[in-house]
Amino acid sequence: MSTKAWNASRLSGPDPSTPWSLRKPLQHGSRPPKGKRLTVCPPTRPKQTIRISASHASQQLDQAKAACLAVTIKDLEEATAVMRSWEHSLVTPQCIAPRYSIIMFMITAVKRLRESKMLTLSWFNQALMMVSKSGEEMRNLRTAMWILANLIPREVLPLTGDLLPSLQQQEPPMLKQ
């Protein structure tokens, strides 16, 4: 605290209630009184750029791709559910041996993607062996996988395993031969 006291009858210093901007400025070349210090802003450091390591940046990119893949899988689940309800309204009850359609194969693949995040060539080959007796089901399976490969964005396609990237580069399968 200050040792000087402010007295209404005699001013021993500047009035503390006077705003700083209205106080009398110093004369050119004079110094402020010794007892008072000027408030100076603390020295600031120059702005530094933030450095992010390459591994951190690639990790963030992978996380963004994984999030994009999760959203894509969710969208595909919703779309295949709509297509399945549409397909059931068109199917006639005369079918004795139910066959897997393109939509049913897509639903199966999307469920597999949701659960394991992978569609591998070995899984595809196993599915082909199961439907190998029916040429129509084999075409439906190939068509469904090709459609999925083209529905999933290209930048996240490698995260789905080795099946879909290889199918995307191929020509579209023929539905009717």
From Swiss-Prot:
Q: Which InterPro entries match?
A: Paramyxovir_NSC
Q: Which domain of life is it from?
A: Viruses
Q: Where is this region: Disordered?
A: 1-38
What's a Pfam family in this record? Paramyxo_NS_C
Q: List the disulfide bonds.
A: none
**Transmembrane stretches, start-end:** none
Coiled-coil residue spans: none
Locations of Polar residues compositional bias?
1-10
Please state which protein family the record places this protein in. Answer: Belongs to the morbillivirus protein C family.
UniProt name for this protein: Protein C
